[in-house]
């Protein structure tokens, strides 16, 4: 692999690749391919793949959301909220070979740009598998919201823009 990895828009043909990465990276927190397909259908502007020399190395899924409670893990949402009040970073996953390359920070920058462009003043997320340490380095702080479907070790977080 000689080129640098780049974030590009996700297409419906990329859903299985995103789901396979989720299976590899997230363990118990993985989601069905239908979840990624739905988020892409509902808000394609917020879905991206990290690719280098034709190999998919990661994905980013973001979308508008309303209210303090995040979308439930591995559940379809049906539609974007009519009156969203925040931008939700649903998932950022990188294969091990893409970690430490700056790709995750670039994904956060992309999410911040998308949120600001859409007029939101904050991004929320649910950190799992100890990822709260990474998210704090990206300017997120703990939020006092229970993300029930994500388990007791999950951490709800927010970044004010």
Protein language model features and the residues they cover:
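Conserved acyl-donor/pantetheine-binding loop and adjacent beta-alpha core of acyl/acetyltransferases
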Residues: 60-92, 99, 147-154
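Conserved acetyl-CoA-binding loop-helix of GNAT-fold acetyltransferases
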Residues: 94, 100-113
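Conserved GNAT acetyl-CoA-binding A-motif
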Residues: 108, 113-128
């Amino acid at each position: 692999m000689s080129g640098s990895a780049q974030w590009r828009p996700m297409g419906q043909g990329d859903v299985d690749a995103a789901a396979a990465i989720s299976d590899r990276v997230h363990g118990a927190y993985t989601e069905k391919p239908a979840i990624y397909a739905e988020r892409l259908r509902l808000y394609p502007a917020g879905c991206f793949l990290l690719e280098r020399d034709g190999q998919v190395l990661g994905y980013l899924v973001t979308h508008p959301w309303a209210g303090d409670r995040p979308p439930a893990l591995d559940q379809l949402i049906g539609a974007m909220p009519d009156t969203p009040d925040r931008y939700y970073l649903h998932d950022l996953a990188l294969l091990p070979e893409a970690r430490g390359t700056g790709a995750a920070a670039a994904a956060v920058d992309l999410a911040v740009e998308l949120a600001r462009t859409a007029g939101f003043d904050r991004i929320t997320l649910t950190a799992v598998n100890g990822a709260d340490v990474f998210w704090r380095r990206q300017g997120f702080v703990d939020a006092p919201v229970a993300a029930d479907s994500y388990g007791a070790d999950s951490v709800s977080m927010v970044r004010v823009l």
